[in-house]
Every structure is written in structure tokens, then in C-alpha cells.
Regions:
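A short core secondary-structure module
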Residues: 148, 152-198
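A short, charged helix-loop
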Residues: 214-241
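Alpha-helical interface subdomain recognition
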Residues: 1-84, 88, 114, 118, ...
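Flexible, small-/acidic-enriched active-site or ligand-binding loops
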Residues: 137, 194-224
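A short, Trp-centered hydrophobic/proline-enriched beta-strand micro-motif
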Residues: 118-126, 170
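N-terminal glycine-rich flavin-associated loop
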Residues: 89-108, 132-135
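Short Ser/Thr-interspersed hydrophobic loop/turn segments at strand-loop and sheet-helix junctions
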Residues: 54, 77-82, 171, 191-195, ...
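Short glycine/proline-enriched turns and hinge-like loops at secondary-structure junctions
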Residues: 69-71, 134-136, 160-164, 180-184, ...
């Protein structure tokens, strides 16, 4: 499918698109992506290649060790990664979130070069068992004892925790100011992974199998007193600047899955012959794919608008939430249509289609459930808060 955004791109953005496509064709061909998904393996060599070529440092200032650029550039790389291996696109988005959090805080700036180069990996530990989208219900505690924080609790659905050098942990360090301000008293801490008080287990999911999803148990884990990111008791404030970006880049993952699935289905229906010719000549096959292409193009424009709004410094909470909602719902419908066009062949282990179908499911409830996204959009329209 032709790229509807091609005519709107700056020259450097088109060059970036061609660069990441070339890198992936050489270092992450489809058969290797399939093996990584099947074997649930994080491809560290591909990750480091992305770092060597400046992809991991996008969105981080050059003077601090990054590659410059903004959300629009990060969205390009995210989308192209998701075309090939959506799991790695998830990890890429989390890498960018960590980088932006560090930069926004004005602290721990020495961590940026290693992150941008791919030599070091940092993970976010926010979600907890039973917490879901209700982040404020977390139970992990951090208590300051002398010159160290002592951390106890557990986290779930944490990408790349087993590969990480450092873990950014959201924990309660102080009591909330009131029952109506549960966000107060939460702090974000940088915690060294390799210590006796941290146990990490991989969690085998049917979706995003190569993303390295883990659970973490903290039992008297330690972090230095200087580990706070931002201000003590204002951990959500330290994260807030990344939320809109995360939603836009999550939408870009949906776009990448959609483009990959649609391109695969189009090739298949043009080559597969039945009843005297290619099955792509039948309207019953054409119309669902045409509808999918139209919806994907519309979602792409919304994602592009949200990304450029953030880069321009404009308020974009509504735009980013809408982009996440529309793109993820779009790809959910799209993979249903494209997989039906391919029939059983699309569900064969050797086909990328079955991977797109599985991975598209995550987009409906991650990084935030679409029902909550609808409530966020409704609140932005002036309706009463419902959560």
C-alpha cells in the first residue's frame, strides 16, 4: 500500500524512512523476525545496530548524547519496526519513554548516552498485579533508611526487565495528602537490577512474544538516596510528559502492524488462484481490503497530526488519545479482514499474518485500555470525569 504521508514529509523524514527500512531488510529479515517471535528472544544485536545508526537516540537532544529529532521521527521508526516485528517496536517505544523522562527531569543525564547507543537498557516498572489501568492503586513501597531506599513489592508486564541494567520503579514513598489525591506520595526511582533483592521471571504471552515481558519481585531491594527522578512524591508528574508521546507511538505500532498485514494480504490475493484466476478479482475479497486501506490512511493522518502537534509544543492530549484509539481499533478490524482473505494460510506458523493478528490484540488495551481512553477523550470534551 502506498504511503499516504509521503507527500507531506520533509526530506530528512523520507531519508529516515528509507534508512530504517534498509537496516531492517538487512538485519531483521522476515524469517529472523519469525524465529525471534517463535523462540521469544530479544534480538540484542539488532537493538545495538539500531543504536549504532542513531535510531534509539531519536527524541533525545544531540548535546546530551541523543540523535535529536522529535515525535514525528520516532513514529516513523516505530511504524517500520512494527511492520517487521511488533515486539521490538514495543521495546523501542519504552526506550524512548525512559529517555524523555530522564531529559524532562533534568537529572541522571549521564544515563542518556548508553541508552541512545544501545549499550545499556533501562526498563519501566509501573504496572502491578491487579492494578491494570488504575496506576494509582499500586502497592510497591519504598522507604528511605539512611542513605538508601528499601523497596518491597511486585510489578507485572514489564518489558525487557531481564535485559535491563537499571529499572525505573514507581513506588509509594509517602502517604497521599488525601483520599482524593492518591497520586501524591508516589515517586519514580532508578534501581540497579543486579542485586539479591530483585527476582525477575519471564512471562510467556501469546502476544508480542519477543518483547521480553517479565514480572519483578522486590524484597528489600536497595537504591541510593539520590535515585529519585524528578521530585519526591511527584512521580506521576515526572511521567506525565511522556504520556502523550507514548500514546502517539503506540498508535504508530498499530499503523505498522496494519501496513504489514495489508501488504501481505494484497500480495497473497494477487498470487493465489482459484476458479480460473487470482482471488483478488472477486469483490468479496477486494472490498474488505479497500475499506481497510481507507481506514488505515485516515488513522495515519490522525497520528501524524498528533505527533506534529507535540513537536510544535501545542497541547495534544486529546489528539494523542484519539490517535491511540482510532489506530488501535482500525488495526483490530484490519487484521480480521486480512487474515480472512488469506484463510488458513494466514494462520500457518510460517506466515507473518498470524503474528500480526496476535500482536494487534495488545493495541486495544496497552499502554492503556481503550475504554479508559474513551473516558479521557470525553473528559476533554467537557464531560464529567468517569474514572
Amino acid at each position: 500500500m502506498a504511503d499516504i504521508l509521503h507527500a507531506f514529509r520533509e526530506d530528512h523524514e523520507q531519508a529516515l524512512t528509507e534508512s530504517i527500512q534498509g537496516l531492517l531488510s538487512r538485519h531483521l529479515p522476515n524469517d529472523r523476525a519469525g524465529e525471534a517471535d517463535r523462540d521469544r528472544v530479544f534480538l540484542r544485536d539488532v537493538w545495538e545496530t539500531l543504536g549504532e545508526n542513531g535510531m534509539l537516540g531519536l527524541g533525545m537532544p544531540e548535546e546530551q548524547g541523543g540523535s535529536g529529532g522529535g515525535v514525528a521521527e520516532s513514529a516513523i521508526v516505530t511504524r517500520e519496526l512494527a511492520r517487521v516485528l511488533p515486539s521490538m517496536a514495543v521495546d523501542y517505544v519504552l526506550c524512548g519513554m525512559v529517555g524523555r523522562t530522564i531529559i524532562d527531569s533534568g537529572q541522571h543525564q549521564d544515563l542518556i548516552p548508553g541508552l541512545a547507543s544501545g549499550e545499556r537498557i533501562y526498563s519501566y516498572a509501573l504496572s502491578e498485579p491487579g492494578g491494570g489501568s488504575d496506576l494509582l492503586s499500586l502497592r510497591t513501597q519504598a522507604k528511605l533508611e539512611g542513605d538508601s531506599w528499601r523497596i518491597n513489592g511486585s510489578k507485572l508486564w514489564i518489558s525487557l526487565a531481564h535485559e535491563s541494567d537499571l529499572i525505573f520503579v514507581l513506588a509509594r514513598t509517602d502517604e497521599p495528602e488525601s483520599s482524593r489525591s492518591r497520586a501524591s506520595g508516589l515517586s519514580l526511582l532508578v534501581v540497579p537490577k543486579d542485586q539479591p533483592g530483585i527476582q525477575i521471571n519471564k512471562v510467556n504471552l501469546a502476544i508480542m512474544r519477543a518483547a521480553g515481558t517479565c514480572e519483578i519481585f522486590f524484597t528489600d531491594a536497595l537504591a541510593p538516596a539520590s535515585a529519585i527522578v524528578g521530585e519526591r512524591g511527584r512521580g506521576l508528574h515526572a511521567l506525565r510528559g511522556t504520556l502523550d508521546v507514548e500514546r502517539v507511538l503506540s498508535a504508530a505500532i498499530s499503523l505498522g502492524i496494519g501496513h504489514g498485514a495489508l501488504d501481505l494480504a494484497l500480495r497473497y490475493v494477487c498470487e493465489r488462484e482459484a476458479f480460473g484466476g487470482p482471488i483478488g478479482r472477486f469483490q468479496a475479497v477486494q472490498h474488505p481490503l479497500a475499506e481497510s486501506a481507507a481506514e488505515l490512511a485516515a488513522a495515519s493522518l490522525l497520528v501524524e497530526h498528533a505527533a506534529r502537534s507535540i513537536d510544535a509544543g501545542l497541547p495534544a492530549s486529546q489528539e494523542s488519545a484519539m490517535a491511540k484509539l482510532v489506530a488501535s481499533e482500525c488495526v483490530g478490524r484490519l487484521v480480521d479482514r486480512t487474515s480472512r482473505a488469506m484463510g488458513a494460510m494466514g494462520m500457518a506458523e510460517e506466515s507473518s499474518m498470524q503474528r500480526y493478528v496476535r500482536d494487534a490484540r495488545l493495541q486495544l488495551f496497552s499502554p492503556v485500555n481503550n475504554d479508559l481512553v474513551r473516558s479521557i477523550i470525553a473528559q476533554g470534551l467537557g464531560l464529567p470525569r468517569s474514572y
